[in-house]
Amino acid sequence: MKWMQARISVAFLILFIMTFSACGTFAPTAPPLIASRTPTILPVIVSPQRTETFTPLPPTATIFPTSTLAPLNLNPQIIVLAENFSEPDDLVLAADGSVYISDVTEGTIQQYTPAGQLNLILSGLSSPEGMAFLPDGSLIIAEQGTNRLLHYDLNSKTLTPFFDLVNNTNNLGVDGILWDGANLIVPDSPNGTVLEISAQGQTVRQLASGLARPTGAWLESTGNLLIADENGNAVFRLYRDGALEKVGDFSIPDDVVADAAGNIFVITLGDDAIHVLIAGTNQDVILVSGLNDPQGIIFDTEGNLIMTDSGNHRLLKVLIH
């Protein structure tokens, strides 16, 4: 039997070489780098028997080991980092520890450095909102006024269209976005869905639908997503099989983040506050009150909170550790 298998293998090899020679040299074609305007739509596959665990790479400098953090301080000190913004909105943390700030009124992106300096990065945008860094260090910007995503190369200082979203409603356009370590997560605000867009903008997959106005997303250390549903007055947990679970009710939640210990921080426009759901108890505690139209919220490199107090035109640091 073995010698017959050997003769068959040799014959197949000769046939393959003759065919390959007749066809000429094989030259692979590189995939296009520009996002398709008619992207591939991949359906959500729900599998009740699924047992595998989704474990993407964590975003840069956003998930912190619990062993390195002091206990959560529920009476935190608040530090004003910068003032005199027009309408600061969303935030993203860069790998060097600097914070990037979008200003929807000014149409700008600014950088707040660890040394406390403000640098203008971009201007002339149409109501910029959420931002996310790709692994190559370039920046994706959600432009609410045009309901599209833009790509900015910080080295060449080149701004190009990345992905055009669809809005056939009278609702405001896209708000927050997130890089989850593998793809862009886009709460499709006007349409009440959550989208997953590939790093090159070539494919898009709908992860969830039926939300009122999703505006913020965060990757938990478990690999699930937290979604702030602003007009739905709730925060949901989105599992990778498409299931949605309500985490809590809030008054106009605009953004949400969570630490590695499982504490969930929600910024709310309805009562101008930061709420925290204490890990293991689901107890809702008002961490900060008396704000004015709070918007973006992220962690800094030390695990403390950075937030925009938009109505007071300032950037704040909340010392929770």
Each language-model region and where it sits:
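An edge-strand/N-cap motif at the start of beta-rich repeat modules
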Residues: A61-I101, E106, L315-H321
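Structural signal for beta-propeller blades
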Residues: G107-I109, N147-L150, G192-V194, N233-V235, ...
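Ser/Thr-rich, Proline-interspersed low-complexity disordered segments
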Residues: C23-Q77
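Conserved beta-strand positions in repeat-built beta-propeller and related beta-rich domains
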Residues: N84, V99-T105, I141-N147, V186-P190, ...
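Short loop/turn segments that connect beta-strands within beta-propeller blades
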Residues: Y112-Q117, D153-K157, I197-Q202, L238-A243, ...
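Blade-level signature of beta-propeller repeat domains, shared across WD40, Kelch, NHL, RCC1
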Residues: D293-H321
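A short beta-strand motif characteristic of beta-propeller blades
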Residues: Q77-E83, Q117-L122, T158-N168, Q202-A208, ...
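Beta-rich, blade/repeat-based domains predominating
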Residues: E83-D96, G124-S138, N167-N183, G210-N224, ...
